[in-house]
Amino acid sequence: MNDLTAKARELRCNLTPQEKILWNILKNRQFYGYRFLRQYIIGNYIVDFLCKEKHIIIEIDGGQHNEEKDIVYDTKRTKYLNSKGYQVIRFWNNDIDNNIEGVYKILQQTFGKDS
């Protein structure tokens, strides 16, 4: 097993509280029948949640993503994922904690289920 695979496995076993909240919405095809994978490797990156069918990645960001070096890294990462045909949606931990209904509505819109 390579380092990235081991890291992805570790992350799957240690979801953040916000990842657990969103995973409870997405797992077992509960969100409109779509299948999601968590802590999935794409290239040299591990994404929080992936819906292969729709080529949509959902990322949950903590406060560390506000720092300059992390903003640069996230921008590079998102450009790479976009170049591979993926749409990347980002939510802050605060969004999950304080506005899960709003997060759900954004997901509905993104997946074309808002009607």
What are these regions (language model features)?
Residues M1-Y34, S83, K113-S115:
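Solvent-exposed, charged helical/coil patches
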Residues L11, L15, I21, G43-T110:
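Basic, amphipathic alpha-helical patches used to engage nucleic acids or provide basic targeting signals
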Residues Y32-Y34, R38, G43-V47:
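Short beta-strand or tight-loop elements
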